[in-house]
Amino acid sequence: MIETIPTKPYEGQRPGTSGLRKKVTVFEQPNYVENFVQATMDVVEPSAKGAHLVVGGDGRYFNFHAIQVIAAIAAGNGVEKIIVGTNGYLSTPAASHIIRKYKLTGGIILTASHNAGGPKNDFGIKYNLGNGGPAPESVTEKIYSITKTISEYKMVKIPPLDLTTTGVRRYGPLTVEVIDPVKDYVQLMKEIFDFDLIRSFLSKNPDFTFVFDALHGITGPYGEALFCKELGMPSSVCQNCKPLPDFGGGHPDPNLTYAKSLVARVDRDNIVMGAASDGDGDRNMIYGANAFVTPSDSVAIIAHHAELIPYFRDGGVHGFARSMPTSGAIDRVGKYKGKNVYEVPTGWKFFCNLFDAKRLSICGEESFGTGSDHIREKDGVWGILCWLNILAGLNAQNPKIKTLIDVKKDFYNIYGRTFYSRYDYEELENEAAGKVMDRMRAIADDKSKVGEAVLPGFVVSEAGDFEYHDPIDGSESKHQGLYIKFENGSRIVTRLSGTGSSGATLRLYMEKHESDSSKFDLDAQVALKPVVHAALEILALEELTGRKEPTVIT
């Protein structure tokens, strides 16, 4: 029986770039989840009634409870069926694929991505559309609007879902199908990549060593299935591959600061190729012995070698794209290959219109997200398999190419090297972060600064506040990041991030292109030292925030 339960609105239920993310303690408030899920049901197109949805998450604390609430409210709103992974597990890329493969109405994904998990940490809920992609602003703003005036929600009291084994079960009016969360995704990867070629490469090069670190996020079982079962590598290549509700007390963010377990193993054992993924499986880091691959370089190198991957060789490449703060390395690939390169705001949803219009095939973000039009989310394990396929393909052409360093050098010899670094200042006071942005805005908004040297050697060539005009639907996204380009080929960008659950996170991005091959092997921080100095001077960062060092350097 459908029950209508009275409720009151909560402030601040505004979904960000990747859904609603808050502390678990916020989600635990009475009716907090119920309100947001009801608001989500109200925007399901064409209607929640009769809808088929996928529901699952990265296994973080509060995941199971949230699934129970979603099932009850889904039943109350006439949803016909939900598909859930065993134990409630489902990586974000796998969820996107399942929506598309089974032509579902949409999906509710439970994750706070790379943010820490546990009773005192973060949780998140996001809605994906029938194309498998994250809900765009037009939809998330509708959800937010409903949460501000909500007065009731509809539910059916159903017994706790049994998510321990696969199978189809009825709970009142709701059908619940529990599936293997890994199976469909593994099948998709086998259709995209040349697994025979990778296996051949591994057998011919016994000195090639590999390690995959899931950081106790959701991709552990996916990594074990692909790298061990399918590609035949020993189980020892997978570490931290058991999903844990608090990610083992760590921060499931694949970067040099938080993926210390991977970095330590690669450095200790001189591993040729190491890779890590994040909490929900949509990010990846590629890190080998003496060879960290920046995300900006990674997507550019994948774009350059796309024809080595069967999916692109057979289906063609429509175009490339990057988020605005991502380095211009992929722009050079696009120019060389005669492909359009789109510059979009941060947030994967901005790529999805381009995918659906067949304008785009490969894209990436500097925040360790790479992906393609095979699904409508970024995809960490896909990115790792790209590198294995590219290494195997290049090695088949030239047996001397067998390391990440070899691939990087080959790329730099064609395009030059775009040195790149990101400084994150986390949990700043909002006022201090605002003052730093004001310093940047003073230059970005002042057109008279063009042609002026703001510091010796740093003459402004262009500056502004990035705005995006979607070429498909005509929508506009303004205030997407402040940038200054200089005549010496360098660029700095600042953004306030919207994905943290407390405090402000200021992100500072710096890059400089180098065509002198004698400098390609420089450490990025050494090569960028003048740019970093200029950025910190322009922004008065230490003076305004009191921070001598960033929280994270990438």
UniProtKB/Swiss-Prot annotation:
<dbReference type="InterPro" id="IPR045244">
    <property type="entry name" value="PGM"/>
</dbReference>
<feature type="active site" description="Phosphoserine intermediate">
    <location>
        <position position="113"/>
    </location>
</feature>
<feature type="binding site">
    <location>
        <position position="282"/>
    </location>
    <ligand>
        <name>Mg(2+)</name>
    </ligand>
</feature>
<feature type="binding site">
    <location>
        <position position="378"/>
    </location>
    <ligand>
        <name>alpha-D-glucose 1,6-bisphosphate</name>
    </ligand>
</feature>
<dbReference type="InterPro" id="IPR036900">
    <property type="entry name" value="A-D-PHexomutase_C_sf"/>
</dbReference>
<feature type="binding site">
    <location>
        <position position="346"/>
    </location>
    <ligand>
        <name>alpha-D-glucose 1,6-bisphosphate</name>
    </ligand>
</feature>
<dbReference type="GO" id="GO:0019388">
    <property type="term" value="P:galactose catabolic process"/>
</dbReference>
<feature type="modified residue" description="Phosphothreonine">
    <location>
        <position position="111"/>
    </location>
</feature>
<feature type="binding site">
    <location>
        <position position="365"/>
    </location>
    <ligand>
        <name>alpha-D-glucose 1,6-bisphosphate</name>
    </ligand>
</feature>
<feature type="binding site">
    <location>
        <position position="113"/>
    </location>
    <ligand>
        <name>alpha-D-glucose 1,6-bisphosphate</name>
    </ligand>
</feature>
<feature type="binding site" description="via phosphate group">
    <location>
        <position position="113"/>
    </location>
    <ligand>
        <name>Mg(2+)</name>
    </ligand>
</feature>
<feature type="binding site">
    <location>
        <position position="21"/>
    </location>
    <ligand>
        <name>alpha-D-glucose 1,6-bisphosphate</name>
    </ligand>
</feature>
<dbReference type="Pfam" id="PF24947">
    <property type="entry name" value="PGM1_C_vert_fung"/>
</dbReference>
<dbReference type="InterPro" id="IPR005844">
    <property type="entry name" value="A-D-PHexomutase_a/b/a-I"/>
</dbReference>
<dbReference type="GO" id="GO:0005992">
    <property type="term" value="P:trehalose biosynthetic process"/>
</dbReference>
<dbReference type="GO" id="GO:0046872">
    <property type="term" value="F:metal ion binding"/>
</dbReference>
<dbReference type="GO" id="GO:0005975">
    <property type="term" value="P:carbohydrate metabolic process"/>
</dbReference>
<keyword id="KW-0597">Phosphoprotein</keyword>
<keyword id="KW-0963">Cytoplasm</keyword>
<comment type="function">
    <text>Catalyzes the reversible isomerization of alpha-D-glucose 1-phosphate to alpha-D-glucose 6-phosphate. The mechanism proceeds via the intermediate compound alpha-D-glucose 1,6-bisphosphate. Key enzyme in hexose metabolism. The reverse reaction is an essential step for biosynthesis because glucose 1-phosphate is the starting point for the synthesis of UDP-glucose, which acts as a precursor for the synthesis of oligosaccharides and trehalose.</text>
</comment>
<dbReference type="GO" id="GO:0006011">
    <property type="term" value="P:UDP-alpha-D-glucose metabolic process"/>
</dbReference>
<dbReference type="InterPro" id="IPR016055">
    <property type="entry name" value="A-D-PHexomutase_a/b/a-I/II/III"/>
</dbReference>
<dbReference type="Pfam" id="PF02880">
    <property type="entry name" value="PGM_PMM_III"/>
</dbReference>
<dbReference type="GO" id="GO:0051156">
    <property type="term" value="P:glucose 6-phosphate metabolic process"/>
</dbReference>
<keyword id="KW-0413">Isomerase</keyword>
<keyword id="KW-0479">Metal-binding</keyword>
<dbReference type="InterPro" id="IPR005841">
    <property type="entry name" value="Alpha-D-phosphohexomutase_SF"/>
</dbReference>
<feature type="binding site">
    <location>
        <position position="367"/>
    </location>
    <ligand>
        <name>alpha-D-glucose 1,6-bisphosphate</name>
    </ligand>
</feature>
<dbReference type="Pfam" id="PF02878">
    <property type="entry name" value="PGM_PMM_I"/>
</dbReference>
<dbReference type="GO" id="GO:0005829">
    <property type="term" value="C:cytosol"/>
</dbReference>
<keyword id="KW-0119">Carbohydrate metabolism</keyword>
<keyword id="KW-0539">Nucleus</keyword>
<dbReference type="Pfam" id="PF02879">
    <property type="entry name" value="PGM_PMM_II"/>
</dbReference>
<dbReference type="GO" id="GO:0004614">
    <property type="term" value="F:phosphoglucomutase activity"/>
</dbReference>
<feature type="binding site">
    <location>
        <position position="280"/>
    </location>
    <ligand>
        <name>Mg(2+)</name>
    </ligand>
</feature>
<keyword id="KW-0460">Magnesium</keyword>
<dbReference type="InterPro" id="IPR005846">
    <property type="entry name" value="A-D-PHexomutase_a/b/a-III"/>
</dbReference>
<feature type="binding site">
    <location>
        <position position="283"/>
    </location>
    <ligand>
        <name>alpha-D-glucose 1,6-bisphosphate</name>
    </ligand>
</feature>
<feature type="binding site">
    <location>
        <position position="278"/>
    </location>
    <ligand>
        <name>Mg(2+)</name>
    </ligand>
</feature>
<feature type="modified residue" description="Phosphoserine">
    <location>
        <position position="113"/>
    </location>
</feature>
<feature type="binding site">
    <location>
        <position position="282"/>
    </location>
    <ligand>
        <name>alpha-D-glucose 1,6-bisphosphate</name>
    </ligand>
</feature>
<keyword id="KW-0313">Glucose metabolism</keyword>
